[in-house]
Amino acid sequence: MEQRITENMGRSLKEHGYLDPVFVGKGSFAKVYRVRDEKRDFQACKISKVTEQWEQECRNSREICHPLFPAYREHWTDGEWGYLVMEFWDGCDLRKMLDRRGRLSPGQAARIALQITEGLQYLHERPHPFLYRDLKPENIRIRVDGSCLLYTSPSPRDT
């Protein structure tokens, strides 16, 4: 899949009220675009081929409600493509921050670690716990105010 939006993808986004897609990144299975909703607020839209993994990510995203994880907005399919819309957070991923600045101060590291620990605790203490299996600097987004967000979707804990 190319970084630019195809005509069909642009049409599908527009039909659901999202405009001005701008490529912001990619993972193993999806590309992520920043889009504007009807209120002109930014949202993140993950576009990928519809697979069981994509369907599971949509279900998981709907269930998780914690400040460390992007808020679910909606999802839909259009042919072979799936669209998952979530809250968009401006900021920088921790990997880029470390590459630019070098190591974090002890205070910065402690604040980030505390937020991540609270989010992981939330996942593990749910009635149906989730595991976050992709914890790495590239998946930790840091805002200017120091708050964090974990990207990628947690998975239900194997029983």
Question: Where are each of the predicted segments found?
Answer:
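AlphaC helix of the eukaryotic protein kinase fold
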Residues: 52-63
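Single conserved hydrophobic/aromatic residue that forms the stacking wall/gate
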Residues: 151-159
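Short beta-strand micro-motifs within the conserved protein kinase catalytic domain, predominantly
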Residues: 71-82
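Protein kinase glycine-rich loop
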Residues: 21-27, 32
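AlphaC helix of the protein kinase catalytic domain
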Residues: 94-104
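Catalytic-loop of the protein kinase fold
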Residues: 124-142
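ATP-binding glycine-rich loop module of kinase domains
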Residues: 31, 35-51
